[in-house]
Amino acid sequence: MADGPRCKRRKQANPRRNNVTNYNTVVETNSDSDDEDKLHIVEEESVTDAADCEGVPEDDLPTDQTVLPGRSSEREGNAKNCWEDDRKEGQEILGPEAQADEAGCTVKDDECESDAENEQNHDPNVEEFLQQQDTAVIFPEAPEEDQRQGTPEASGHDENGTPDAFSQLLTCPYCDRGYKRFTSLKEHIKYRHEKNEDNFSCSLCSYTFAYRTQLERHMTSHKSGRDQRHVTQSGCNRKFKCTECGKAFKYKHHLKEHLRIHSGEKPYECPNCKKRFSHSGSYSSHISSKKCISLIPVNGRPRTGLKTSQCSSPSLSASPGSPTRPQIRQKIENKPLQEQLSVNQIKTEPVDYEFKPIVVASGINCSTPLQNGVFTGGGPLQATSSPQGMVQAVVLPTVGLVSPISINLSDIQNVLKVAVDGNVIRQVLENNQANLASKEQETINASPIQQGGHSVISAISLPLVDQDGTTKIIINYSLEQPSQLQVVPQNLKKENPVATNSCKSEKLPEDLTVKSEKDKSFEGGVNDSTCLLCDDCPGDINALPELKHYDLKQPTQPPPLPAAEAEKPESSVSSATGDGNLSPSQPPLKNLLSLLKAYYALNAQPSAEELSKIADSVNLPLDVVKKWFEKMQAGQISVQSSEPSSPEPGKVNIPAKNNDQPQSANANEPQDSTVNLQSPLKMTNSPVLPVGSTTNGSRSSTPSPSPLNLSSSRNTQGYLYTAEGAQEEPQVEPLDLSLPKQQGELLERSTITSVYQNSVYSVQEEPLNLSCAKKEPQKDSCVTDSEPVVNVIPPSANPINIAIPTVTAQLPTIVAIADQNSVPCLRALAANKQTILIPQVAYTYSTTVSPAVQEPPLKVIQPNGNQDERQDTSSEGVSNVEDQNDSDSTPPKKKMRKTENGMYACDLCDKIFQKSSSLLRHKYEHTGKRPHECGICKKAFKHKHHLIEHMRLHSGEKPYQCDKCGKRFSHSGSYSQHMNHRYSYCKREAEERDSTEQEEAGPEILSNEHVGARASPSQGDSDERESLTREEDEDSEKEEEEEDKEMEELQEEKECEKPQGDEEEEEEEEEVEEEEVEEAENEGEEAKTEGLMKDDRAESQASSLGQKVGESSEQVSEEKTNEA
């Protein structure tokens, strides 16, 4: 019967227990809590045993007992004091385990039996305590009051209460940590808060530790979780810590690469897929894996079945967001690009081209594939009028049309601005942006079909990457209106030709920025010119049809067009010049001059055989070419243009010689010429694609084996000189590539067809290094020297060309022919097409160099007009090329530009180096070039020492050896890693092995021999075996010395006992025996050395030798004993 009530009483006691706890709290609040905590510590003996119990009454008792002196007056009578004394004695008898059991019984409802068993020992006291506990319930304090003093453990108790609630009773006065048992609290205070000289205390939380390692481990608890993990892993060996996330690294360069994760910098870009990387390791692995190599056209021929991705084509107004592929960076001078592409746009740039509706001028209908398969690769061209911002882009590889895409001319503008580092083109673009925008608005308002009539199929190649890593853009443009395009066999519609006058006046509708004054300037400027090829040429434009330059006796060349006139639409020029009379097989004079000057730049003094080849390539008589070279050598024709540069980028300063040409025309033209310079960039009608800019920008283009490099001098006019002669601008600004009259007829053919189909001209046998040399105008010629010598050093792979028909009439079309054996754009030049190469990556390399380019001294005319000799091949040439690409106005002799403090700065990123060689090696990171190739496995490396270490894999050489474990390494890196991480481990291993060997080693030679024989096969390395044999030899020598001493002692004894004759016999016998022993030892040593190479044979030999030595020693000892 007692069990039931006991259980019920116990049940009811649980909530009261919380109240009791609160009661204690209330009482303690009346006194100083610190004093009470100290009192806990002071009364150790009386409180410890009572506090050890976790039961309800037991845990309450210690607190009441300690607080008793302060509240004895509040209690009624001394009965509780007496009971407490008795209860204390009972608890002492029980011990902590029984008390714990009792506590568990009081908490749980279903353990009444155990409660009853405990009750047998303490029934009276428990009942008395329960009565006292009932009286304590009268205090109404909330349970939360006491929880404030406990630890979070108490927060988990349920309504009925759990043992965790008792931890609130015993709280550490130093750190507020709660304990269920007072002994635990004492130990906690003793080991964590008592300070002495031997302890190590935490400066943050006053914890003390007996060992420093404990303190260090504890200090990690004050750090963030990431720091804790890092410290435990690294063992405090990582000195370089990231300030952003706290991650630490052993090496500084690892930290530098890690910081790029926070900054978002990704300096490494794949030339193939344009993917960017922040770590050089991931970039190198990406390059070596060649995952994106399949996306790259081979030899300029796109692979079939390529996925096509869409290239965004926003309207002209949205030019900043166009995803062109140039590598953009701010130059050291921090010249801001007008419209920089964001990093994200560069990253997400599409690799391939997607089929998109082809927008062609209304007058052109390419509904059927061209004869030569030009359009076979892509769908039929649709003659639809396009919005102003859209320009058709047709990939024109050597074989056929690949995916046509839409390109915004603003993209081209961005490309040119990036490629052209000169201030002039940038200023021109900035100054005329508003004008162009207004013009573009007009064109948008104009009838699309009419605009189509003025547009010409323009070709612009997207950034192209050849097999050799060359990245480029080829712009081949013509100013011819579609109306003048002839019907070519390729099913192109021929538009009705327009009269010359109408072309001049009407050809520039609303969208054209060229003013009517250009006609005047044209008329004024066409008077004086001198032919570069011959001395006497007709001075009249009408004589152009008669100008074929196959006869030296022909009259003087017709006067060149003024720059402004050259910028005018090609139709007017062609109409005026009667270009239509020229046969398609006759290359324009300007193109011929470009070729000749390119040859001259390659070799100023060609041999007769070379001259004949040049004459064949340019379709000119040998004597004409020879005479031209003589004039160039004599200085009559200057490669460099001495014309003054125009102060304003927009204006075209015509030489003073052209007094006929009104300067007002220039004043009126600034916008026009500027537009012309810009026009390719900005969909403006003006035809001028600044080759000069491109050539200037073709700093990016390099004389290295990269494809067409139109490096032109500053004063070089961008527009190529044609027979009709375009006015050359003496300006520093980008070259005006407006097509002169003579090209009009061939321009009538679609640019694509004229380039591909009209490749009537002989294929160039060798790529021309058409470095744009500055041209000095003849006293009568304003234009002749304007043509840039295109620096054409084609790579092994031919460029892919993209034809872009423009809605606006004047956008120069760009098409380049990519024959494997010919210079890609020379055919376009010969076909009256202006060709521009805008290298997107300044650092382009080709694996093969054509014979013409192989001539070591290559004089390249820098955009600033300075000539410099440099090797066409070798890594130095690469660095020169790279610097040339980036030479803004500095002399080219500084191959790599120095900053103000004499450092070498990378032009593709912001890194600066002290040595030019360091910069050159750094450039490999951008280009992906690995110049050091293994001759055995063809693996290439950026650094020579990497190749040296790689060669050791083939040779088996391992020059690095651990002095502890004897392991050898071929690479210094693996050796360093072993020494840093395993050195101590392998040291212990060696010591253990030595100790075991010493234990196994016996005092006799035989045992040593066997030990050596057993150890040798177990050794994985020859060095380990050598160390073992040395130790064995030392042991054997000691034993031999001991044996010799024993033998000497025996001999002395025998000498005392035996006669002299016997002594002599014994001496002879001993000598013989010693010789045998020595021979055996020598044989043993030889066997040991052989055993190092062949373990099995060494073991057998060692055992046999050991037997021999043992037998000989036994014989000697037996004979000596017998004699004794």
Curated annotation (Swiss-Prot):
Enumerate the SUPFAM superfamilies for this protein: beta-beta-alpha zinc fingers, Homeodomain-like
Q: Which InterPro entries match?
A: Di19_Zn-bd (IPR008598), HD (IPR001356), Homeodomain-like_sf (IPR009057), Znf_C2H2_sf (IPR036236), Znf_C2H2_type (IPR013087), ZnF_E-box_Homeobox (IPR051574)
Report one GO cellular component.
Answer: nucleus
Give the position(s) of the covalent cross-link described as Glycyl lysine isopeptide (Lys-Gly) (interchain with G-Cter in SUMO2). Answer: K186, K195, K307, K331, K335, K347, K439, K493, K504, K515, K548, K553, K774
Polar residues bias spans: 656-687, 874-890, 1100-1115
- Residue ranges of region Disordered? 1-124, 142-163, 304-327, 551-586, 636-714, 856-898, 989-1124
According to the UniProt entry, which residue ranges have a biased composition of type Low complexity?
A: 18-30, 309-322, 692-714
Cite the post-translational modification comment. Answer: Ubiquitinated, leading to degradation in a proteasome-dependent manner. Deubiquitinated by USP51, leading to stabilization.
How would you summarize the oligomeric state and partners of this protein? Interacts (via N-terminus) with SMARCA4/BRG1.
Instruction: Please report which protein family the annotation says this sequence is part of.
Output: Belongs to the delta-EF1/ZFH-1 C2H2-type zinc-finger family.
Q: What is this protein called?
A: Zinc finger E-box-binding homeobox 1
| Organism the protein comes from | Homo sapiens
Q: Point out the gene that encodes the protein.
A: ZEB1
